Regions:
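Short linear sequence signals and composition-biased patches located at protein termini or domain-edge surfaces
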Residues: 153-243
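Short, glycine/small-hydrophobic-rich surface segments
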Residues: 61-94
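Short helix/strand-bridging catalytic loops that position acidic/His residues to coordinate divalent metals
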Residues: 38-43, 148-154, 201-204
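Exposed loop/turn and edge beta-strand positions of beta-sandwich/beta-sheet ligand-binding modules
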Residues: 12, 118, 179
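N-terminal leader/signal peptides at the extreme start of proteins
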Residues: 1-7
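Aliphatic-rich helix starts adjacent to a transmembrane/signal segment
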Residues: 7-63
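Type IV pilin-like appendage domain
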Residues: 83-176, 206-209, 236
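Short, conserved loop/turn and helix-capping segments at secondary-structure boundaries
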Residues: 47, 51, 78-81, 153, ...
């Protein structure tokens, strides 16, 4: 009787089938886990990015202000201006003491009881793009004309090209003779890259959207409205010059 020195074809096929039964589910589990991990990182990144954007917007709005017009009542609507063009692009603009390094250079244009401060102008632009549901959010800083860093067209920065929705809404609450004005900020960001949506590699109906909201207190405005008759040093004239 001879000893068997090799596997038969049937035995090899049985071994291969058993290995496939083990490998295929394992591969699917690992593949699904990898995709889930990547998706988790994407969503975590977009949440952190949205929080950074809200922090920047909040900083700009909390230091917002308005030109002084004697004899007129002042409200949050003096600060805020919004326009929409024929293409659906939205531009939100307001004056503010915010503006990077310039914040530490807010100096009076004259001495005395009414010393004007110079303002910067900031624009947030929500731009629609052809062929994609993604919008672009830009921030443009126009430094006061007397500032050495001021330049025509302002300092433009793209904040995000993954925007679904962006809104700043001014509101005022009145009670017992006092009022409190504030801004409601709403922001929605996609967790996918805009180029992927344009190429059709993702389903726009299944994209994860991270939603953010914040309320912002315009400190200077509320202080002036609720403390009438105080020194007007923090009123400002954006067109004031040295002299």
């Amino acid at each position: 009787m001879k000893n068997r020195q090799a596997f038969t074809l049937i035995e090899l096929m049985v071994v291969v089938c058993i290995l496939m039964l083990v490998i295929i589910p394992t591969y699917r589990i690992l593949s699904h886990g990898s995709k889930s991990a990547i998706k988790g990182v994407q969503r975590n990144n977009i949440i952190m990015h949205g929080q950074q954007l809200l922090s920047q917007i909040k900083s700009d709005l909390s230091a917002s202000a308005f030109p002084l017009v004697d004899g007129e009542m002042h409200s949050i609507n003096n600060i805020f201006n919004e326009t929409t063009d024929s293409g659906g692009n939205i531009k939100i603009s307001f004056y503010t003491f915010s503006g990077g390094k310039y914040e530490n250079q807010v100096i009076p244009t004259s001495s005395g009881g009414m010393a004007y401060r110079r303002l910067n102008k900031i624009e947030y632009r929500l731009i629609s793009k052809s062929g994609t549901i993604f919008k672009t959010l830009e921030r443009v800083v126009f430094l006061h004309p007397s500032h050495p860093g001021a330049k025509a067209g302002g300092q433009r920065k793209v904040l995000s090209d993954k925007v679904n929705f962006f809104e700043i809404r001014p509101e005022t609450i009145k009670s017992a003779g006092f009022s409190r004005s504030f801004f409601r900020v709403s922001l929605q960001l996609f967790d996918q890259d805009s180029s992927a949506a344009k190429s059709g590699s993702i389903d726009p109906d299944k994209v994860f959207i991270a939603e953010f909201s914040e309320t912002v207190n315009p400190l200077i405005l509320n202080s002036i409205i609720n403390n009438p008759g105080l020194n007007r040093n923090w009123y400002t004239d954006p067109s004031a010059t040295d002299g």
